[in-house]
Curated annotation (Swiss-Prot):
The keyword Transcription does not apply. GO terms for biological process: nucleocytoplasmic transport. The modification Phosphoserine is found at residues 133, 293, 394. It comes from the Eukaryota. Residues 1-335 are annotated as: Disordered. Not known; weak suppressor of a mutant of the subunit AC40 of DNA dependent RNA polymerase I and III. This is Suppressor protein SRP40. Present with 12900 molecules/cell in log phase SD medium. Keywords: Phosphoprotein. Residues 26-115, 149-168, 176-186, 194-233, 243-268, 298-316 have a biased composition (Low complexity).
């Protein structure tokens, strides 16, 4: 904890390139936890937004961003990234961008590291807020479906953590897929360094870790997943100067669809923005129907194949009884764990359990030939010859022709 706060104090002293590198690294650590669940990251981000607002309020452009309508964009709609409590000033082509980006970079690096530090503390609180936010989100989705999107309909699919929001108003914010919260949007603004630093400030200061892609068109459609978790965050009072209500309503300055985006994205783990949520649900339904149709086809085909197999096998099956052990006089009953009367063989090959030698029956064939040539008791007579007890005739090919003479 202490080490991270020291890093926050050191950030403003770094050069511009080092700031960008450290912003990405710090924001990626916070975004990894945010992608897991927007509800879990919500409480931590709300607490961090209070910290980030205090740091950015001293910055030069904090006055414009505190009103949370500060996102100066070409399109007339107010951006949903207005939830970024302090210098969110989403990248626009206006001239005020350079000031807000320089001030935002200092606040973003501090607040993003604060978010990662505060997330460990607020894990216990997240479970309670997740339930409340789910209830609120369900209500907000119904409202959002009736409300049209703002004038600049930015087509953006904020999938998972990375929200690559491409707006139609001539500005593309390509957010980094690795760091969702620091979506460094490269826009048509004056300088890329300004856009990255300002986008990072908007992402870190927004009261949500998840995707606050500061789209240049400032349309509400996608920072949607960012405003999504911010509304669920707003249960805990954010000290930021933005208009986000602590009562749980979405960012007041953000236009109509931000509240609806919150419900969908937070429920689906930051995956789909409002514009994509309908299509994604349709895809899910199509997949479900396809799976069901496959499931219906497979049992039908299997049922067709199994009767044919069973019929063919039943035709070939033979019920050959194993028989019973015949006990001769003077014999004891052989111990057996198997009751032969209950056993049936399905083929005649199974009834033969005679052992064929490992040498491919060559030993058995040789033994048969020797038995034919030298007699039935060849081995026994051979051993007698070794002992000298054999009394036979001259050795010929006829059986029993061996004889040793003293």
């Amino acid at each position: 904890m202490a080490s991270k706060k020291i890093k926050v104090d050191e950030v403003p002293k770094l050069s511009v390139k080092e700031k960008e590198i450290e912003e990405k690294s710090s924001s990626s650590s916070s975004s990894s936890s945010s992608s897991s669940s927007s509800s879990s990251s919500s409480s931590s981000s709300s607490s961090s937004s209070g910290e980030s607002s205090s740091s950015s309020s001293s910055s030069s452009s904090s006055s414009s961003s505190d009103s949370s309508d500060s996102s100066d964009s070409e399109s007339s709609s107010s951006s949903s990234s207005s939830s970024s409590s302090s210098s969110s000033s989403s990248d626009s082509e206006s001239s005020s961008e350079s000031d807000s980006s320089s001030s935002g970079s200092s606040s973003s690096s501090s607040s993003s590291s604060d978010e990662s530090s505060s997330e460990s503390e607020s894990e216990d609180e997240t479970k309670k807020r997740a339930r409340e936010s789910d209830n609120e989100d369900a209500k907000e989705t119904k409202k959002a479906k009736t409300e049209p999107e703002s004038s600049s309909s930015s087509e953006s699919s904020s999938s998972g953590s990375s929200s690559s929001s491409e707006s139609e108003s001539g500005s593309e914010s390509d957010s980094d897929s690795s760091s969702s919260s620091s979506s460094s949007s490269d826009s048509e603004s004056d300088s890329e360094s300004d856009s990255q630093s300002s986008s990072s400030s908007s992402s870190s200061d927004s009261s949500s870790d998840s995707d606050s892609s500061s789209s240049d068109s400032s349309s509400d459609s996608d920072s949607s997943s960012s405003s999504s978790s911010s509304s669920s965050d707003s249960d805990s009072d954010s000290d930021s100067s933005s208009d986000s209500d602590s009562s749980g309503s979405s960012d007041s300055s953000s236009s109509s669809d931000s509240s609806s985006d919150e419900s969908t994205s937070s429920d689906s783990s930051d995956s789909d923005s409002d514009s994509d949520s309908g299509s994604s649900s349709e895809l899910e339904t199509k997949e479900a129907t396809a799976d069901e149709s496959k499931a219906e086809e497979t049992p039908a085909s299997s049922n067709e194949s199994t009767p044919s197999a069973s019929s063919s096998s039943s035709a070939n099956k033979l019920n050959i009884p194993a028989g019973t052990d015949e006990i001769k006089e003077g014999q004891r009953k052989h111990f057996s764990r198997v009751d032969r009367s209950k056993i049936n063989f399905e083929a005649w090959e199974l009834t033969d359990n005679t052992y064929k030698g490992a040498a491919g029956t060559w030993g058995e064939k040789a033994n048969e030939k020797l038995g034919r040539v030298r007699g039935k008791d060849f081995t026994k007579n051979k051993n007698k010859m070794k002992r000298g007890s054999y009394r036979g005739g001259s050795i010929t090919l006829e059986s029993g022709s061996y004889k040793f003479q003293d």
